[in-house]
A protein has these predicted regions:
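Hydrophobic alpha-helical core bundles mediating ligand binding, dimerization, or RNAP-core interactions
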Residues: 25, 29, 49, 53, ...
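Active-site neighborhood of HAD-like aspartate-dependent phosphohydrolases
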Residues: 1-42
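Conserved SAM-binding loop
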Residues: 14, 92, 112, 143, ...
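Asp-based, Mg2+/Mn2+-dependent phosphohydrolase catalytic module
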Residues: 1-4, 97, 101-102, 116-216
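Short, acidic loop-to-helix structural element flanking the phosphoryl-transfer center
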Residues: 2, 82-112
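Alpha-helical substrate-recognition element adjacent to the catalytic core
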Residues: 26-60, 66
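Metal-dependent phosphoesterase signature
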Residues: 35, 58-94
Length: 216
């Protein structure tokens, strides 16, 4: 037995929503009188909304009650949703559509494993939704990556044993989650950060069905 399913992270793998997260978090940080850099934003990739805010407050040595934190997180989300509402298929990352088409044509199951609570909106706007046989997002999971829950739920929904799944991830926490879940991982980004993955590539243009099957 070999490859049966591919599970995709969303932000940083299929679409570049990190730039919108950055702009919205920056806007929020500025209202709190804080600065927020792209380097700090890097550390929020794959991390849930509430945890991201907690980190930003920690970096600034700020504390506030949970109620206030929830208020700020939803303020940021409002701005973020406004930004992603204008997304189109042009914002799908290089190589993604070609690979998804090839997987579909070869009856490989396709699942989403994202921490985002806005994943469905993004998939709708970019026209990616019809490719997916199962969607697992931040509304479904209770434990964040590196916990393997998001991918294990995906495999379960697809009816595939984890060992026949390959995960595509741009965040080291996501690669760790895939490995903990007994799946193979392809890292999208740099070797230094994602070295634990079986294969690391710059983007999906470097991947076709044969490359994935060769991991087995
Ligand atoms: P939301 P992924 C993650 O998406 C993003 O990388 C991360 O920056 C974001 O905080 C998280 O989703 C939650 O997003 O605020 O939309 O629920 O990489 O897991 O697809
Ligand atoms: Mg990601």
């Amino acid at each position: 037995m070999g490859l049966e399913a591919c599970l995709f992270d969303l932000d940083g793998v299929l679409v570049d929503t990190a730039k919108y997260h950055y702009l919205a978090w920056k806007q929020l940080a500025n209202t709190l009188g804080l600065d927020f850099t792209e380097k700090e934003n890097e550390q929020l990739k794959g991390i849930s909304r509430v945890e991201s805010l907690r980190k930003i407050l920690n970096w600034a040595g700020m504390e506030m009650p949970q109620e206030k934190q929830d208020e700020l997180a939803s303020l940021k989300n409002g701005w973020y949703v406004e930004m992603i509402s204008g997304m189109t298929q042009n914002e799908v990352l290089p190589g993604a559509l070609k690979l998804l088409d090839e997987l579909k044509a070869n009856h490989i199951k396709i699942g989403l494993g994202s921490a985002s609570k806005n994943a469905k909106l993004i998939l709708d706007n970019t026209g990616l939704k019809p490719y997916f046989d199962a969607l697992v997002d931040g509304n479904i999971v209770s434990k964040s990556k590196p916990d393997p829950e998001v991918f294990l739920r995906g495999a379960e929904l697809l009816g595939v044993s984890p060992e026949y799944c390959v995960v595509f991830e741009d965040a080291s926490a996501g690669v760790e989650a895939a490995i903990k879940g007994n799946m193979k991982a392809i890292g999208i980004g740099n070797e230094e950060e994602l070295g634990e993955a079986q294969l690391v590539v710059e983007d999906l243009t470097a991947i076709d069905l044969r490359t994935i099957q060769n991991l087995f």
